[in-house]
Amino acid sequence: MAMYPRELKWGVAHIYSSFNNTHVHITDLTGAETVARVTGGMVVKADREKPSPYAAMIAASRAAQKAMERGIAAIHIKVRAPGGHGPKTPGPGAQAAIRALARAGFIIGRIEDVTPIPHDTTRRPGGRRGRRV
């Protein structure tokens, strides 16, 4: 006997974590329809707390609650850092957001990193002599 219902409704949790904020965006499998979208800045008062793991945790749990109300029971997770010219590693809120989604009761499918990595990039800002401070 299976523990879960035969047909699970799957979704995709897109977690964008920079050093300034954390976005948790849950969509259907195609990514076309938004189910829930919460950011760290929406759940804390002070701007300096937006990138914190606490803000990411609260944002992820709120998004999870909205998604469960819409019937999503299992999710794949896509983690993204700024990438390109910016940092290629996710910010401090990424891990907290993943843990919060797991604790919310979702069945976790795949966790993948979708940070845009340039293969021979365009020129970085700053010019030939660099950024003069």
UniProtKB/Swiss-Prot annotation:
GO terms for biological process: translation. InterPro entries: Ribosomal_uS11 (IPR001971), Ribosomal_uS11_archaeal (IPR019961), Ribosomal_uS11_CS (IPR018102), Ribosomal_uS11_sf (IPR036967). One of its GO terms (molecular function) is rRNA binding. GO terms for cellular component: ribonucleoprotein complex; ribosome. Keywords: Ribonucleoprotein, Ribosomal protein, RNA-binding, rRNA-binding. Pfam families: Ribosomal_S11 (PF00411). It comes from the Archaea. Coiled coil: none annotated. HAMAP family: Ribosomal_uS11. Belongs to the universal ribosomal protein uS11 family. Part of the 30S ribosomal subunit. Located on the platform of the 30S subunit. This is Small ribosomal subunit protein uS11.
